[in-house]
Amino acid sequence: MDGKLIFLGLVIGILILAWVGAGVLWHAAEMAEIVAPLDPYEVEELSVMTVGTGNEYENPNRHGPSTAITLGRTVVLVDVGRGIAEGLRAAKIPLNQPSLIVLTNVLPLNTLGLDDLLMTGWLVPREERMRIVGPVGTRKLVESLEDAYAAGREALGSSLGLTPAGGRIEVTEVSDGYQEELDGLTIEARALPGGPLPTLAWRFSDGKSRIVVSGSGWGQDVLASFAGGADVLVHEAAYLPTVAELEGTGAEVAHPERLELEAEFHTSILEVGKLATQAQIDRLVLVRLRPPPFFDLQVRSLVANDYEGEIVVANDGDTVFP
């Protein structure tokens, strides 16, 4: 009897050790996903990934706005919001891989991740300057960042033997009609009028498909023309009720008058479907949603009142095209 108990104890002990070992292996694999070097990200056809889908307010489930346009091993980021390093890691895109960053404008929500990508990507390492193209105001922003980080950059680079160029930025300011070719990808900019600062929408094509990315709430007619017939439009949408609509609901808003100001600053979720219909696009990808969607169906139902194409309520890391 004692022998049986001893044997049973051994079996239980082995099972416990196996269970613990499996847990350790699983945790090790999980850690490797977080910290191990990444292979270059590569796709066979023009693709779009929503690296960050949040807006200007904090949200632990959504990083700041950034959209990755990829073709082969070429990665172009449209805007670089907060949490960009973590967003790219989750998307399995090495931080030193993006060939180009294009900005829609220099509002903080579009640029808060620039220093993060610059300095964290330098450690991968990045051997060449990080390249940024944006509207007027981009150069001043970049020069200010480089000045602010000068002492820390010098100390980090010399201590770790990093290539100096990898911690610097090559910046180009552009305006309406800008165009360039990058590894089989045609990139075009269109100025969107009517806003408080220079703003660009961006179009990408590989000769077969066309993608348009915009983040502003102004210049809608120009944007509709620029995006005309595109396969995908990546755009913001916000539901911001008026003070009158809030009256009687019991909802407490600290600064209700600011809602009206913000409504003029963003594209209403009640209007974005009309924009997509006017542009005759095949697929509308919604990002920067304000407030964040509780249920995707609610958003789709509202937008579908004015748009019959495909509606995608994107999350961080989603591949939304093809």
Language-model segment annotations:
Residues 2-212, 223, 298-321:
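Binuclear metal-dependent hydrolase catalytic cores
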